[in-house]
Amino acid sequence: MANSNLTNAKKAKNDEFYTQYGDIQKEIEAYLEYDSEVFRGKVVYCNCDDPFESNFFRYFVLNFNKLGLKQLITTSYKPSPVANTQLALFGDDKTLAKSKGRPKINANKFIINEVQDIDRDGEFNLKDVAKQLKTNKHNEWTPLEGDGDFRSDECVNLLKQSDIVVTNPPFSLFREYVKQLFDYEKQFVIIGNMNAITYKEIFPLIKANRLWLGATGNGSDMVFAVPNGAEIAEGDRQKAARLGYVGDYTRLGNSCWFTNLDHGRRHKPLPLMTKAEVIKFSAKKPFEKYDNYNAIEVSFVKNIPSDFDGIMGVPISFLDKYNPDQFEIIGNGQTMANELGIKPVGQKFVDDYYRQGNKGSINAKWNNLVYHIGEKVYVPYQRILIKHKKK
């Protein structure tokens, strides 16, 4: 049992990333620019957030009245690797002393119904929130009965009461987390790994326009605070330091926002060149056709031709530019190969592949998207198949 607990604690520590306030602010403001009333009268639930540590709680409680929230609910997970140790109470507000009376072992639940200038100093800030919570004035601060797992009955009941979920869930549980959001028909803005786009549980939701990428930070460097002792690649730690975050921080270059809230960037047309212009000014060569599927390879999103009516294979980074009014998603070239009718590569491709010195394990029945240029073989990484929408 002891070994099991240690293993679980280690896994939790290495799966816990604390989002920066500025990243949250930029993302939420993008939805407000598109629809200033999107949060008005809504219950926001942050169900993977220690209220004492989370910048999600900090952002929404400080902007409670500006957003017009009806209620803010936050719940934390026990044990939190950083609880009571790493971050100052309510983020980096140095004017607040740490409360000695707050629960130190149990997972916590905060329910905010009202915020106001309780100390009457002329401004609303985190001091007012702290005082309101300590006096239980119109708000609730209690330990949870369980461990705060988002799958627990206790947290599911809170989820049922909410309208919009905003958080950074454990990446290792992303599939299960998203499934729960759709099971309970919730709107959401959450952080995940860019590679989640290709998950067989996630991609069909993207294809059906039930889930899409958020407005900011997709595939770029996002910095996260991590628990002391968490395993961090030294290169990522150094990159975070170069971005101004020294210490227990990591940089994730493949993180992104996932949402089903609309935003303006999603409807911004992608500027394109014609096929001839791409060949002349960018690619410097003709488009290649796949050996085993009737589509062309487009290795860079900027090279999508405006005048090609057929199917095109593009990198997954395309989804950051995806406009559902401009393009139709046909499928995922790897996870949907059988459904799409992608043919096996055949023995000639296998022979050419190994003759070229490649070490991967493939056979003639393999049906990944592939193409030749002369005798040289190419296996593009993770292609999404798209076509222009007919006007």
Regions found by a protein language model. Give the residues of each.
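Class I S-adenosyl-L-methionine-dependent methyltransferase catalytic core
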Residues: 1-391
